[in-house]
Amino acid sequence: MKKTAIALAVALAGFATVAQAAPKDNTWYTGAKLGWSQYHDTGFYGNGYQNGIGNGPTHKDQLGAGAFLGYQANQYLGFELGYDWLGRMPYKGSVNNGAFKAQGVQLAAKLSYPIADDLDIYTRLGGMVWRADSKANYGRTGQRLSDHDTGVSPLAAVGVEYALTKNWATRLDYQFVSNIGDAGTVGARPDNTMLSLGVSYRFGQDDVVAPAPAPAPAPVVETKRFTLKSDVLFNFNKSTLKAEGQQALDQLYTQLSSMDPKDGSVVVLGYTDAVGSDQYNQKLSEQRAQSVVDYLVSKGIPSDKISARGMGEADAVTGNTCGYKSGRATKAQIVCLAPDRRVEIEVKGIKDVVTQPQG
């Protein structure tokens, strides 16, 4: 039996792959095993079990089996709860015969140590709550005896475990349980060893795939427009900035800086009213727009991000409400046409909404 155990252990070690032998931390597994169960110290005596019983061969080697449920706390420590059928051992004599059988529920700590990426050695230490049953038949007298006993015995095991895949593993296990049964009740108090080959399925071993990060939203290009009155920026019919106009542009520059205009573009649009020739008004609107650009560049706006454009008399705000058609305008008409004399600053690529300065 020892040669068989060594051969199986070597065979398992030869199947090394990259799978992990130990389950992931804080996961559960379940399995079953089948193997050879052997009883030791099987002398029968006491409480009606006379010396003549079992005067023939005692079949100490029997088929054993079991099932288990385990919890893997970490790579090195797990806990197992299992059921073992230790086998039915008949003892046969020429006249007297009988049988002894045992089964139990075990609870043990499993201590593992990896010797390869896919192979662990381990020991299990714990106890077994067992039930032992026996019966005897006396051919000469026709007497039949049967009884059972229960108790707790220490349990120890050693083994190797090999990971077939992430979820499946197999193990070779050699287990020892001492003093099963009370001799005064069931006529024997044997020890038991079981060499078994088991297979287990481990839950929760698949790698958790993190969801793909949501794509960054596409930048929203927006256009913000600021309108400054030309009468605040310039004297009538002039393109040189007044002190009051510079103060208004200082306020505007503060807001443009907070908006980070490097990420966008700035267009300064100059407008005039309809008083005067088209050619003159076009030139005046260009000069006024350029004056604003030059001042903002001097404050720190990159020159390649800002441009000037003269719009002349285009896009009049007042329309026909002021009654001016051509020629010399009255003072009242000049005052009425003031909204047409303006500078508009168009900022593209800036999403934040800001409040335009008051002129």
Swiss-Prot record:
What residue ranges are annotated as transmembrane? 27-37, 62-73, 77-85, 103-114, 119-127, 154-163, 168-175, 194-202
Domain called OmpA-like: residue spans: 221-351
Q: Which InterPro entries match?
A: Bact_OuterMem_StrucFunc, OMP/PagP_b-brl, OMP_bac, OmpA, OmpA-like, OMPA-like_CS, OmpA-like_sf, OmpA-like_TM_dom
Q: List the disulfide bonds.
A: 322-336
Residue stretches of each sequence repeat? 210-211, 212-213, 214-215, 216-217, 218-219
Q: Where is this site: Part of salt bridge gating mechanism?
A: 80, 171
Q: Where is the signal peptide?
A: 1-21
The UniProt keyword set, sorted, is: Cell outer membrane, Disulfide bond, Ion transport, Membrane, Porin, Repeat, Signal, Transmembrane, Transmembrane beta strand, Transport
**Record keyword Lipid metabolism present:** no
Q: Keyword Transmembrane, does the record have it? A: yes
Cell location: Cell outer membrane
Gene Ontology CC terms, in alphabetical order:
cell outer membrane; pore complex
Per its UniProt record, what Gene3D superfamilies does this chain match? Answer: 2.40.160.20, OmpA-like domain
Q: Where is this region: 5 X 2 AA tandem repeats of A-P?
A: 210-219
Which family is it part of?
A: Belongs to the outer membrane OOP (TC 1.B.6) superfamily. OmpA family.
Which comment does the entry carry about domains?
The extracellular loops are most variable in sequence, and in some bacteria confer sensitivity to phage and/or colicins.
Protein known as: Outer membrane protein A
Q: Which organism is it from?
A: Serratia marcescens
Q: What is the lineage of its organism?
A: Bacteria, Pseudomonadati, Pseudomonadota, Gammaproteobacteria, Enterobacterales
